[in-house]
Amino acid sequence: MNPHFNSFKNIITNPIKFKFFLLTKLPAAFFAGLSIKEFSTDKSVIRVKHSWWTQNPFRSMYFAVEAMAAEMASGMLVFGQVYKRNPSISMLVVKMEVDFVKKAIGIILFTCEEGQKIQTQINQSIEDGEAKTFICTSTGKNELGETVAVFNITWSVKAKK
């Protein structure tokens, strides 16, 4: 585990620091109203609410907002493992596949539970200096617990020399 993970967690679980983090690093997520509901080394849950700001012409959540929340659910786990790491580690989304199952209306929670996989891949990149690619799944569920979308996000990480 990244020795600086808890420092990162303290930033993003503090509501004021998290809003500043979004405004400076991910302004679109700030304006879409994304928030963190749960965060640990293993799991990240991102909350997004269907509203006038996040809707499409069909009165459901715009797909790009769903993609942003899904990517953030896995991305926060990746970012927590690369935060202040020495050597520094680059992180990049290289592919995204999605199944939209149901109209996204109301509050949607995107969950990624791939923290252990992420830690393993980053540690291997540090050990051998090679880029690693891996898929993280982020599942969006509505307030009734029904799946609205399943995103498979392919990340690439590489320890810099």
What label would you give each PLM region?
Residues F30-I36, V94-F100, Q121-N123:
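Short structured motifs
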Residues S35, E97-D99, T111-E113, T137-T139, ...:
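Residues located in well-ordered beta-strands
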Residues W53-G75, S88:
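Hot-dog-fold acyl-thioester-processing enzymes
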Residues M1-F31, W53:
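Alpha-helical membrane-targeting segments
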Residues N2-T13, A104-I105, G115-K161:
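HotDog/MaoC-like acyl-thioester-processing domains
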Residues F31-M61:
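Catalytic strand-loop segment that frames the active site of acyl-thioester-processing enzymes
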Residues L77-Q116:
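Hydrophobic beta-strand-centered segment that forms part of the acyl-chain substrate-binding groove
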